[in-house]
């Protein structure tokens, strides 16, 4: 493709094919001569390539990465002090409960839609309908990768969820029991094994943005890291650094990783493709109407966001300052430093005057998100409130993240001296001093925590990091004053705190529990 440029026209047919007809045959028995019935589809390579494109859409739609995952999950991190706005922000302030927040029920089925579409492709493709082995491997590799991707977010957001690896053929299979996280992670690894062996190392320009063998290795290595299988994580992540051509962008282009400039670049290991849409309809599964650029309102400043926005907490800025890191600081946090600019190149203090005044009224520092906030899209008055016309790709895994995950896996495998050079590659790009090679395991662990703040804040990793490091209670619990003497969610009040045994996971959506009595609610909800 370039995947984002023609994704939507190509997937229209496949999306309509996957729509379930809710009409009873006794009520309506009319055939649509323009419709494509499933028996008439999946006949050749072109059909399967269309099906692959349709498989991506639930992930990029507004009900998942197009918007909902940001306010529903990623903004729970300690970086963001959320200004409350009705039910829209209760999940990002750690106050969400079934019945008083919207987003969990939106995200959950999107992931299973992608899994269903991947299962259909895997089951229907064969040597007869796609005789070309290379083409068949490309199609299957993408299906296995996206099924693993969807299951990765299911297990890390909800924990005990159904593991659906085939299309249902019996009534019993329509009501699956939850699987253990161990079984889900094993299935993720198995699918990524298939993806690694089938996907190409790179795609032609017209298909840039599709997952590659490097994408699959990186996600498999990440899965091993999260499940504490450190030696396996090292093997996979090191292979990404040795057998592929990924590189860090130079310091002068660091912020290209978060704008519409230079998408699918040499640092991108896997990124979701977005195309700005003029005709937006909330929640639809029709390409061109239900996908937003990255729904930038969740990263825009308070006086530009219709949901009241948020502020960056001062302890995040302090990590940059302690390390002398201005390259990543200036690309991550918008605030009043010499030469700081706002939207469209307007001086920061002029462009952010109302936001700065609001910070003063709230008694907090005037620090704002810069990544994915659309600063390069024009002056503030030209920025669409919903962001649907922007079309900024979201970089799911960057090479810098691979280097830091590799360093972490090596350090956890008691090899701090081997870990440090990989951290220093990331620091060198940021033009800051290298770490001493004599640091011990505990010191390297803290260095990785800090480095991930400087490199990855605002990209959707921090909350997952805090949970897997067992730091979420320390940083977000009721006793935390890490944010300049305040709780990181102080603007939402005293109930906006992390609760151990509950907030590690989201709740299973109530409609899913009502539809399937075999499911059970997560602890604390």
Role assignments for model-derived ranges:
Residues 2, 23-73, 182, 321-324, ...:
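Acidic, glycine-rich segments characteristic of secretory precursors and extracytoplasmic regions
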Residues 11-19:
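Bacterial N-terminal signal peptides
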Residues 23-24, 81-82, 111-114, 187, ...:
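Long, intrinsically disordered, low-complexity segments
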Residues 44-45, 49-53, 57-63, 84-158, ...:
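Conserved, well-structured interaction surfaces
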Residues 95, 267, 319-398:
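Flexible, polar/acidic helix-loop-strand segments at domain edges
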């Amino acid at each position: 493709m370039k995947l984002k440029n023609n994704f939507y026209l190509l997937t229209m047919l496949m999306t309509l094919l996957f729509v379930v007809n809710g009409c009873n045959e006794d009520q309506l028995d009319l055939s649509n001569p323009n419709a494509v019935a499933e028996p008439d589809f999946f006949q050749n390579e072109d059909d399967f390539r269309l099906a692959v494109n349709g498989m991506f859409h639930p992930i990029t739609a507004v009900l998942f990465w197009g918007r909902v995952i940001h306010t529903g999950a990623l903004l729970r991190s300690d970086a963001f002090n959320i200004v409350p706005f009705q039910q829209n922000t209760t999940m990002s302030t750690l106050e969400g409960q079934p019945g008083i927040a919207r987003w969990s029920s939106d995200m959950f089925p999107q992931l299973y839609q992608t899994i269903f579409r991947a299962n259909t492709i895997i089951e229907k493709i064969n040597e007869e309908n796609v005789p070309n082995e290379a083409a068949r491997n490309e199609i299957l590799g993408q299906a296995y990768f996206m099924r693993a991707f969807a299951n990765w977010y299911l297990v890390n957001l909800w924990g005990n969820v159904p593991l659906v690896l085939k299309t249902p053929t019996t009534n019993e299979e329509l009501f699956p029991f939850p699987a253990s996280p161990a079984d889900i992670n094993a299935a993720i690894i198995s699918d990524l094994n298939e993806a690694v062996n089938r996907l190409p190392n790179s795609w032609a320009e017209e298909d840039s943005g599709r997952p590659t063998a490097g994408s699959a290795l990186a996600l498999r290595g990440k899965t091993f890291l999260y499940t504490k299988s450190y030696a396996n994580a090292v093997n996979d992540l090191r292979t990404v650094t040795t057998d592929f051509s990924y590189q860090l962008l130079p310091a002068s282009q660091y912020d290209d990783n978060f704008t519409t400039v230079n998408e699918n670049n040499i640092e991108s290991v896997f990124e979701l493709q977005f195309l700005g849409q003029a005709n937006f309809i909330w929640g639809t599964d029709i390409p061109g109407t239900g996908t937003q650029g990255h729904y930038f309102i969740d990263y825009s400043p308070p006086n530009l966001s219709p949901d009241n926005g948020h502020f960056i907490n001062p302890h995040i800025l302090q990590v940059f300052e302690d390390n002398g890191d201005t390259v990543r600081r200036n690309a991550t946090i918008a605030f009043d430093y010499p030469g700081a600019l706002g939207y469209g190149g307007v001086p920061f203090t002029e462009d952010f005057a109302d936001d700065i005044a609001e910070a003063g009224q709230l008694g907090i520092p005037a620090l704002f998100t810069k990544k994915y906030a659309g600063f390069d899209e024009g002056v503030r008055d030209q920025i669409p409130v919903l962001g649907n016309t922007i079309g900024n790709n979201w970089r799911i895994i960057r090479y810098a993240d691979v280097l830091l995950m590799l360093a972490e896996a090596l350090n956890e495998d008691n090899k701090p001296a081997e870990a440090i050079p990989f951290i220093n590659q990331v620091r060198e790009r940021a033009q800051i001093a290298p770490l001493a090679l004599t640091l011990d395991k505990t010191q390297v662990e803290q260095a990785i925590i800090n480095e991930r703040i400087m490199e990855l804040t605002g990209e959707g990793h921090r909350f997952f990091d805090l949970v897997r490091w067992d730091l979420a209670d320390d940083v977000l619990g009721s006793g935390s004053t890490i944010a300049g003497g305040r709780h990181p969610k102080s603007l939402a009040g005293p109930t906006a705190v992390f609760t151990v045994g509950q907030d590690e996971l989201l709740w299973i959506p109530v409609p899913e529990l009502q539809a399937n009595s075999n499911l059970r609610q997560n602890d604390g909800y």
